[in-house]
Amino acid sequence: MNTKIFLSVSLFLLSACSPASTPIETPQPPTATVVSANALTSVAPAGDGPALANCPIFPADNIWNTRVDTLPIHPMSEAWIDNIGRDEGFHMDFGSGSWDGGPIGIPYNVVGGSSVTKHTVEFYYPDESDAGPYPIPENPGMEYGSDHHILVVNTDDCKLYEIYDAIYENGVWSGGSGAIWDLHSNALRPDTWTSADAAGLPILPGLLRYDEVLAGEIRHAIRFTVENTAGYIWPARHQTDDPQDGVPPMGARFRLKADYDISSFPPEMQVILRAMKEYGIILADNGSNWYVSGAPDERWDNDMLHLLDMLTGNDFEAVATSMLMVDPNSGEVK
């Protein structure tokens, strides 16, 4: 989201922040224009990047899909973790069931075919938004809480459409900002531009999805939030505050320490923990400290997810990723 903005599948949503001041129509169950996310979730063959509904979730050589378990520790690791909260616990901000009136997690919609209506969205930050149009299905899965994110994958062209603060009133969609991503491309947002996330990054590639856990392997970094950020580093493109010593920037990558013993956790949680060791977590938005993002799914076991609450900042370390960069305007890695 942009500097003026924000602290800020199954087909449902996240509970977050405070309610928006503008009234919003309560999302209803997706109509036939939305294909079941569970039915279309695909797990890529070994060596490939993540995939969804026969579309890649960015190329295999994208920074989101790159392991960081052998990279050096970032020189600011200790300071950043102290700033966020070394002894503060993690929280998996997704699950099954509902909370505060809506399902728990960030939803995504999968659409395709001529029946999908494309909408011109009226943005209140148009200077950093992609004009569209946006293929928004009737009654889309939308994030509950204050951010009202809508995420849509169009299988016709394998493009990802993301909107922040989406509101539908009087037959017209409006929003704070919007971004369109070619899922076959490593191109980043223009430098200093927001997206539907404060870091100027896409949201979908960082979501934990139940089908990945079911398949036994997650091959991408995971989105998370903290309260205070300053500046931004590659691959992020946007900041909510100017750089400050010791305050983590948008785009910072962290990983679970290699010696953290995961053997006592249930197998499903070990899949998530291995991903945190191998691919790490990416700071993408302002929110509660150490809140980890995922897509809602009735198959999640919330009690099991709460076992990960025992993770603390002290179990992680920041990673130096700049050596992987090929071009500052690309997510491609060496």
Task: Set out the residue ranges of the language-model regions.
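C-terminal motif of bacterial Sec signal peptides marking the signal peptidase cleavage site
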Residues: 14-16
